[in-house]
Design a protein with these regions (language model features):
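Short, well-ordered beta-strand elements
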Residues: 33-48, 68-71
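An extracytoplasmic/periplasmic, membrane-proximal ligand-sensing/linker region
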Residues: 151-183
């Protein structure tokens, strides 16, 4: 009889243990970020998300091993937080908002500035990369964009702009037809 009373207690303890010992989904999200080339945009910068999906399609056609995906943040604050802490390697913003991010002004005034390197322009949009984004990856990404340029409305090399900008070194190498850098 005593064993019959212990069974419900054991089940309750086992249930509590399973709840607290279960794996967090965050580990899977980190693995997802490592397996896919994520291009972040934000709801607050309306044209960025639809264009990021087009960009992802072109990248995946030209460079399938990148397994590129569009990612969308809800707010500019979230964008700045994820990008400035190296959680997202690439960011697509309108030129106005990209300048604001780099200077910590405008919509990013209360969040602060973030350092970034230019990969490519698409009309009023700019693709930015983390300064720590490997030169080899920037070279591969730029090369994929160049090969898929006909499918990317308004794609413009950063070398064609008249303003002085901070272009990613790997992008410069690809645009100058230099060989792919080592990792």
């Amino acid at each position: 009889m005593k064993n019959n009373k212990k069974i419900p207690n054991i089940i309750v303890y086992l249930f509590i243990y399973l709840i607290f010992a279960a794996h967090s989904p965050w580990g899977q999200y980190l693995a997802y970020r490592e397996q896919h080339l994520l291009i972040m945009s934000t709801r607050e910068d309306a044209p960025t998300y639809p264009y990021s999906k087009i960009l992802v399609d072109v990248i995946n056609k030209q460079l399938p091993e990148a397994s590129s995906r569009a990612a969308r943040a809800k707010t500019f604050g979230r964008v700045q937080g994820l990008f400035s802490t190296n959680q997202m390697p690439l960011l697509l913003l309108s030129k106005k908002n990209a300048k604001a991010l780099l200077k910590g002004k405008g919509v990013f005034k209360k969040f602060g500035a973030a350092d970034a390197k230019v990969i490519y322009f698409f009309d009023d949009l700019v693709l930015l990369a983390q300064p720590s984004f490997p030169d080899k990856f920037a070279w591969l990404l730029t090369n994929a964009i160049i090969r898929g340029e006909k499918d990317l409305l308004g794609a413009t090399s950063p070398l064609e702009t008249k303003k002085i900008i901070d272009i990613h070194p790997g992008t410069i190498m690809a645009l100058n037809n230099e060989k792919m850098p080592e990792l």
